[in-house]
């Protein structure tokens, strides 16, 4: 999405202000369709190859759509559209599994890509440190103890077919809470990133991260982060309140004593304490749309003119909206995202982070068994009205 000059930004700001006061309705415009069922590639790619992040996509230079929706062993998907994808069982990224929490490279999920015209793709990496399974000696407590999470940065130079850390670990770190790993601390840390979205008002890049529980001075909730340089993992700044993105993220290992307060993010109001699966700029609503799943329930929507002030999240798509034939394969909802296949042609958005009045909601379902219905990625057409 092309950034705007000062005059056009001012006009856009007035239009956004007018649009933000209107009521918004979101309704399903048709039944969900399966985009990928993990049982279809079970015997080829393995039982652990499942949708374990929200669905992401970008358009490569050759016109092929690349889709990311996987686990710690990353297999790419490609096809002519976001609806017609073929899974490749070659691993383009394998989790590092480093047992040192200060390296920020243990169990890694490749997520949130952003493509450039020259073939470079950067992606956020959700990185879990699980002392119950990776650290020696093993932790004798169970989750939510012995667990923390951070966000790193990966890069590809070939439109996503191969990946590496953007900088040698731990210097690929994007975001961490300012506290060292502690086995007795309840699960916490910045993780579960949304997609990266461009704000047309300032041309900067943003994403949302989630902290599950209070840790030190850091409250639980959603932190919005911003940068002008996607290639520099240290350039991201968290929201500090009063419209300012001035919170830097540093490694807590070796951080001077007493500095934690300078690295605490102000969490968003009106959003639940659950991960934001996807964010999109709506060219119809002139607002940002966020989709959220909490504890396996339905998908909630929230709207914002500026990524700071959000409406109270409201569940607008749930089990009752599914046809009976789909309900039998779904025990819970998870991993929502917004991908509009018309975005590339309509507004030049090769990262599918813009949506129009009619745009699909992507989401994943948990089934009954990995060998029968398993996890699936679905796409449901949604209609927006104001």
Q: Which role fits each region the language model picked out?
A:
Residues 1-6:
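N-terminal secretory signal peptides that target proteins for export/translocation
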Residues 8-23:
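Cleavable N-terminal signal peptides of Sec/SRP-targeted secreted and luminal proteins
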Residues 23-106, 114-183, 200-272, 282-328, ...:
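Beta-rich carbohydrate-recognition and catalytic domains
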Residues 53, 107-109, 190-193, 273-275, ...:
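Beta-rich catalytic cores
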Residues 57, 113, 194-196, 277-279, ...:
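Hydrophobic core register within WD40 beta-propeller blades
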Residues 181-184, 331-337:
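Short, charged/polar low-complexity linear motifs in solvent-exposed/disordered segments
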Residues 187:
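Substrate-binding groove/exosite segments of carbohydrate-active enzymes
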């Amino acid at each position: 999405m092309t950034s705007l000059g000062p005059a056009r930004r001012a006009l856009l700001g007035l239009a956004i202000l007018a649009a933000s006061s209107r009521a918004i309705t979101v309704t399903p415009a048709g039944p969900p369709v399966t985009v990928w069922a993990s049982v279809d590639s079970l015997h080829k790619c393995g039982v652990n190859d499942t949708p374990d992040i929200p669905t992401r996509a970008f358009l490569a230079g050759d016109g092929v759509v690349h889709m990311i929706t996987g686990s710690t062993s990353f297999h790419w998907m490609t096809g002519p559209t976001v609806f017609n994808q073929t899974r490749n069982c070659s691993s383009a990224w394998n989790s590092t599994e480093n047992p040192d929490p200060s390296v920020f490279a243990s169990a890694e999920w490749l997520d949130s890509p952003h493509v450039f015209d020259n073939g470079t793709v950067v992606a956020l990496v959700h990185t879990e440190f699980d002392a119950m399974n990776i650290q020696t000696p093993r932790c004798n407590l169970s989750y939510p103890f012995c667990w923390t999470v951070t966000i790193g940065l990966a890069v590809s130079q070939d439109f996503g077919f191969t990946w590496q850390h953007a900088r040698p670990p731990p210097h690929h770190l994007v975001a961490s809470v300012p506290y060292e790993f502690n086995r007795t601390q309840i699960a916490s840390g910045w993780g579960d990133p949304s997609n990266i979205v461009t704000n047309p008002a300032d041309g900067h890049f943003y994403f949302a991260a989630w902290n599950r529980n209070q840790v030190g001075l850091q409250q639980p909730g959603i932190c919005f982060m911003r940068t002008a340089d996607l290639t520099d993992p240290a350039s991201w700044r968290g929201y500090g309140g009063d419209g300012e993105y001035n919170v830097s993220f540093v490694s807590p290992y070796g951080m001077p004593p007493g500095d934690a307060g300078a690295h605490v993010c102000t969490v968003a109001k009106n959003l639940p304490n659950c991960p934001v699966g996807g964010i999109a700029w709506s060219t119809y609503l002139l607002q940002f749309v966020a989709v959220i799943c909490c504890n396996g329930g339905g998908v909630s929507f929230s709207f914002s003119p500026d990524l700071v002030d959000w409406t109270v999240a409201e569940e607008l798509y749930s089990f009752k909206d599914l046809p009976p034939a789909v309900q039998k394969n779904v025990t819970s909802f998870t991993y929502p995202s917004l991908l509009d296949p018309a975005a590339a042609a309509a507004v030049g958005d090769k990262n599918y982070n813009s949506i129009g009045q009619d745009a699909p909601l992507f989401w994943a379902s948990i089934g009954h068994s990995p060998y029968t219905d398993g996890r699936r990625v679905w796409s449901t057409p949604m209609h927006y009205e104001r």
